């Protein structure tokens, strides 16, 4: 599968991110005995889109939760490991990544109803922003710029479609740390950028021009930290409660897309993820 040279040229010229192939991307579940209770944490998805002609050496190790990448390409690729389906739990990663030209290291995924392609970019070498700047979110020791960009008649997990991209771009790039995914989902929702049902979610490397290499290990945890969201325009700053503040009581809500209340629980309860829109103290 691949993107034609005409489409790839249009994507690069338009400043848009490279996309997966038009047909739905297949996923790889190596351990069919993974229970539903463990699927949120166990890596079960290998994203391995490499356009025809792209010079990419990608070596995933799902059991170890790591992958290596080496590329020198003018063709598009998106590769990485993660989860199907994705969720709002934090992702911790570590390793190395460097690029000359375009090189993106990001939490990457899709939702349906609405169809959305999303990124939390930790490294964004050579990437030119496009679309509308919607504000910033401060979380995980850094500040991210929030962008929304519309893709018209472009490849997606549902075939050729028109859809929006939600993009958080870290101002101070890093190659190790924790991405509190819930904080980005909340910040996007506050900016009117709502996700639907989550599809796959990976820690990915992407490029369509240049060279680079890296090795990344990743895992998924529970809970989350504090965040500050600053929308653009004449609106006020909204700050979610700190994890050190008063927590929600037993059976109270403690997370979810658009949730602005407590994100921790009073002792001895913990915040348990139920779905993208609701987490509960149990």
From Swiss-Prot:
Keywords: Carbohydrate metabolism, Glycoprotein, Glycosidase, Hydrolase, Polysaccharide degradation, Secreted, Signal, Xylan degradation. Its main location: secreted. The active site is at 117 (nucleophile), 206 (proton donor). GO terms for biological process: xylan catabolic process. One of its GO terms (cellular component) is extracellular region. It is found in: Secreted. Pfam families: CBM_1, Glyco_hydro_11. Pathway: Glycan degradation; xylan degradation. Residues 214-245 are annotated as: Disordered. GO terms for molecular function: cellulose binding; endo-1,4-beta-xylanase activity. Residues 246-282 form the CBM1 domain. Significantly inhibited by the wheat xylanase inhibiting protein I (XIP-I) and the proteinaceous endoxylanase Triticum aestivum xylanase inhibitors I (TAXI-I), but not TAXI-II. It comes from the Eukaryota. Residues 1-39 form the signal peptide. Residues 227-243 have a biased composition (Low complexity). Glycans are attached at residue 33. Its EC number is 3.2.1.8. It catalyses: Endohydrolysis of (1->4)-beta-D-xylosidic linkages in xylans. It is an enzyme of class 3 (hydrolase). Optimum pH is 3.7-4.7 for birchwood xylan. Endo-1,4-beta-xylanase involved in the hydrolysis of xylan, a major structural heterogeneous polysaccharide found in plant biomass representing the second most abundant polysaccharide in the biosphere, after cellulose. Belongs to the glycosyl hydrolase 11 (cellulase G) family. This is Endo-1,4-beta-xylanase B. The gene is xynB.
């Amino acid at each position: 599968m691949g993107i034609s040279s005409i489409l790839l040229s249009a994507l690069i010229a338009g400043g848009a991110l490279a996309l997966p192939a038009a047909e739905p991307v297949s996923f790889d579940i190596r351990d069919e005995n993974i229970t539903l209770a463990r699927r949120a944490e166990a890596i079960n998805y290998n994203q391995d889109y490499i356009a025809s002609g792209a010079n990419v050496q990608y070596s995933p190790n799902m059991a170890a939760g790591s992958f290596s990448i080496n590329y020198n390409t003018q063709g598009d690729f998106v590769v990485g490991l993660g989860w199907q389906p994705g969720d709002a739990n934090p992702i911790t990663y570590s390793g190395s990544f460097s690029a000359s030209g375009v090189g993106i290291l990001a939490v990457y995924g899709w939702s349906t109803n609405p169809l959305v392609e999303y990124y939390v970019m930790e490294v964004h070498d050579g990437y030119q922003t496009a679309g509308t700047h919607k504000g910033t979110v401060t979380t995980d020791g850094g500040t991210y710029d929030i962008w929304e960009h519309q893709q018209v008649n472009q490849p997606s997990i549902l075939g050729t479609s028109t859809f929006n991209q939600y993009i958080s771009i870290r101002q101070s790039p890093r190659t190790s740390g924790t991405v509190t995914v819930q904080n980005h989902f909340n910040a996007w929702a506050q900016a009117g950028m709502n996700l639907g049902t989550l599809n796959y979610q990976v820690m990915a490397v992407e490029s369509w021009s240049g060279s680079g290499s890296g090795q990344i290990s990743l895992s998924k945890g529970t809970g989350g930290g504090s965040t500050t969201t600053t929308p653009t325009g004449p609106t006020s700053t909204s700050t979610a409660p700190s994890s050190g503040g008063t927590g929600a009581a037993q059976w109270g809500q403690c997370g979810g897309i658009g949730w602005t209340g407590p994100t921790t629980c009073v002792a001895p309860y913990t915040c348990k993820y139920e779905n993208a829109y609701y987490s509960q103290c149990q």
